[in-house]
Amino acid sequence: IGAVRDSQSCHVELICDGVHVHPSVIRATFAMFGAERVILISDSMRATGLEDGEYTLGGQPVVVKGNLATLHDGTIAGSATNLMDCMRFVVKNAGISLEDAVMCATENPAREIGIFDQTGSIEEGKKADFVLLDKELNIVGIYIDGKEQSC
């Protein structure tokens, strides 16, 4: 937090899976830095989207239950939550606006790694990769290169 506060060119990366960071800390971070300096990340491991069970992460056995991956001693090993679920969590549980959550999951990361001229927003000349959401923030459409994909 201190490094980001001291450097205007840094972003805060928040794991918003409902395990790593409490909603009150999410709200405080947005209030302190503004949505323009927050990047949502998932800390997602390769077992994300698979059934609960035992998997390997970095050569270590991990147990996945719900959206959490732990070592056998209970230590958090990572998340089994995708970025869409993280975005949904900040909106529904931390009270962050949908517009800010989308910016933090798309535009801000693209700017940070220097590819905002290609992706990160829906604009002419950019990659047309996006999802359509319903009012409950469920994915109802997926588009890659402007072509609808099956959900």
Regions from the language model: what does each represent?
Residues 2-18, 25-133:
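His/Asp/Glu-enriched, well-ordered alpha-helical/loop segment
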Residues 20-21, 139:
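Glycine-rich nucleotide phosphate-binding loop and flanking beta-alpha elements
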Residues 136-143:
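Short, Lys/Arg- and Gly-enriched loop/turn segments at beta-strand edges
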